[in-house]
Amino acid sequence: MKKILLTNDDGYHAKGIKALEQALEKMAEIYVVAPKHEKSACSQCITITTPLRAEKIKGKEGRHYRIDDGTPSDCVYLAINELFKHVSFDLVISGINLGSNMGEDTIYSGTVAGAIEGTIQGVPSIAISQILSNKNKNTPLSFDLAQKIIQDLVQNIFTKGYPLKGRKLLNVNIPNCSLQEYKGECITPKGYRVYKKEVHRRTDPKNESYFWLGLHPLEWQKRENEERFSDFDAVVSNHVSITPLNLDLTSYSDLKSLESWHRGMLK
């Protein structure tokens, strides 16, 4: 039977990872290693300055752990290299995140980081996120569409094989709409995320300042010379966005011009 490792950044008890397990439990043997507490926006952080403690969850056949103060990357690393080192995983899936992970948000995302860690460890990986609000703001949050999409995607992978080669992963974003409103799937590039750079200053009872970094509204613009629907464009039109991500961040188109610039600097 196929084996799938699940993680997230919303924490072991989050609704999204429960919905993900429920969607896949009849398709594969499911293992879950997730942070004990929410670790949103922790990016690719791994814990190397303090010890990690893994708590085995009772009644889960030894396949569920939560990691005290662990990040999604910690969870995947520990699962593959220690907790379940005897298991050969067919997939790592991170999610279902409560909120989108599109554009440059993928760099901040702990959800995407969980899938990146799976990719680094040599396992085909998927990050999946559920949009919390879009133009249909009165639509109640439901994982029905996300569950259907991940089932279809996993079945396709089990049948045809993983579609990407090398250190690449799939990033999936689910629109906040019903199954009836859903218009299909789009293969998309990342959009250009627009940030507001908000910081909220507060004062505690001792008259000391503290700060909350602002949550940014979902705003974006098209990238230059890009005609495809972006991930943002897809979800606001009730399409599922599927984006291939590459771990290699090298800007190959700039190598030659950078060489010329560097030679000029040395003269």
From Swiss-Prot:
Q: Name one GO cellular component term.
A: cytoplasm
- Signal peptide per UniProt: none
Kindly state what the record says about how the cofactor is bound.
Binds 1 divalent metal cation per subunit.
Q: What is its main location?
A: cytoplasm
Which Enzyme Commission numbers does its entry carry?
A: 3.1.3.5
Q: Where does a divalent metal cation bind?
A: 9-10, 40, 97
Q: Which cofactor does it need?
A: a divalent metal cation
* Catalyzed reactions: a ribonucleoside 5'-phosphate + H2O = a ribonucleoside + phosphate
Looking up InterPro entries in the UniProt record yields: SurE (IPR030048), SurE-like_Pase/nucleotidase (IPR002828), SurE-like_sf (IPR036523)
Q: Which GO terms describe its molecular function?
A: 3'-nucleotidase activity; 5'-nucleotidase activity; exopolyphosphatase activity; metal ion binding; nucleotide binding
Which keywords are on file for this protein? Answer: Cytoplasm, Hydrolase, Metal-binding, Nucleotide-binding
The listed locations are: Cytoplasm
**Which Pfam families does this one have?**
SurE
**Assigned protein family:** Belongs to the SurE nucleotidase family.
For this protein, the record's PANTHER family field holds:
5'-NUCLEOTIDASE SURE, 5'_3'-NUCLEOTIDASE SURE
Job description of the protein: Nucleotidase that shows phosphatase activity on nucleoside 5'-monophosphates.
Instruction: Please state what the protein is called.
Output: 5'-nucleotidase SurE
